[in-house]
Every structure is written in C-alpha cells, then in structure tokens.
C-alpha cells in the first residue's frame, strides 16, 4: 500500500515540475513547478505549503550565488521538495510570470524573494526580502511548518540551528 501511495504521489507531483538538471544556476537544483494554481490545489489535498520563489533569470551575481549556494544545498533541496510544493516565477519576464508578479505585488528585476503560501494563495508568514543564505531561509521554513501545524523534520531544524547565520 505504501508503494502505491508513493507512486501515486510521484504522478501527481511530476507533471507540475521539471527536471532539476535543466535548471538555470539562479534556481539551483530544486525540482520546480511552474503552475501555481496546480500547486495550490495540490496544497489543499496534501496540506503542504507552497514555496513560491520569485527570481531573476538570467540574474546578477547575487541571484546566481543564491542558486549555487542556497538552492543547491542538498539539505535545503531535500527540505523544499519533501515539505513544500516549490514553484518558481521569473521576475524579469512577461506572460504568466508578469501576472504573478502583479498578483503578489512583487517588483520586477528584484533580488530573489521566497513566499510561503497556503492552499488559498495567502502568505502563511509575512513576506520578507533579503533572505539570501541557508540559515535564514531554513528558519523561515521551520516557522512556516510550525504555523500550519506540520511536523518539522529534524534535518531541517538542525539546518536552521547549525548553519552560520551568513551561510
């Protein structure tokens, strides 16, 4: 039964994500979704919050560093992919990306911003920018999971506690 549930979960999540090895450096090695509405619906079904990344691609050196160091950290990637529904929005493109920037009142050509959303698309914790390193991001992930009453994995809690504040 566990195997069936795992296979079903993979098929539910797979269509909204892309392979991490196709990622630009700015978005790290996370397997990202691009369909926020699908992620919100899945959030309602699973209880997992949406991890919504607004990122400049191609981006400046700061955006590239965030992707290379934070969003490629294996422990961060594991926590994002197992505890959240990751969706990326390019903050320097038109179309659906532009529509989402406007919906969330996010500026164009800005440094990365991560928002944590419930199944209705509301912020679970207040928006915060200048979260550019592992520990502050891990702390916000812990805060989000606690706010929605989900268990915080020991590995994520350890990452939030042990990482130097700057990395």
Regions found by a protein language model. Name each.
Residues 30-34, 55-56, 69-97:
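Thiol-based oxidoreductase modules, predominantly thioredoxin-like and allied folds used
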Residues 4-13:
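Sec-dependent N-terminal signal peptides
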Residues 36-76:
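Local sequence-structure signature of Cys/Sec-based thiol-disulfide redox active-site neighborhoods
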Residues 13-19:
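C-terminal segment of classical bacterial N-terminal signal peptides
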Residues 21-46, 160-162:
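N-terminal leader/targeting and pre-domain segments
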Residues 57-60, 91-95, 121-123, 131-132:
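Solvent-exposed loop/turn segments at secondary-structure junctions
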Residues 48-49, 100-115:
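Structural micro-motif
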Residues 69-71, 108-152:
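Non-catalytic, surface beta->alpha helical segment in thiol-disulfide oxidoreductase systems
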């Amino acid at each position: 039964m566990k195997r069936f549930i795992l296979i079903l979960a993979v098929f539910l999540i797979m269509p909204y994500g892309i392979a991490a090895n196709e990622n630009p450096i700015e978005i790290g090695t996370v397997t990202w979704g691009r369909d926020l509405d699908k992620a919100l619906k899945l959030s309602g079904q699973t209880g997992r919050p949406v991890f919504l990344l607004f990122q400049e691609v191609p981006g400046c050196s700061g955006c590239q560093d965030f992707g290379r160091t934070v969003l490629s950290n294996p422990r961060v990637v594991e926590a994002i992919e197992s505890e959240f529904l990751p969706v990326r929005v390019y903050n320097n493109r038109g179309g659906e990306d532009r529509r989402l920037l406007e919906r969330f009142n996010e500026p164009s050509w800005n440094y990365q911003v991560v928002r944590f959303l419930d199944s209705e698309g509301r912020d679970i914790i207040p928006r915060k920018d200048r979260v550019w390193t592992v520990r502050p991001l891990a702390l916000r992930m812990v805060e989000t999971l606690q706010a929605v009453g989900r268990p915080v994995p020991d590995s994520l809690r350890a990452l939030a506690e042990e990482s130097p504040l700057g990395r």
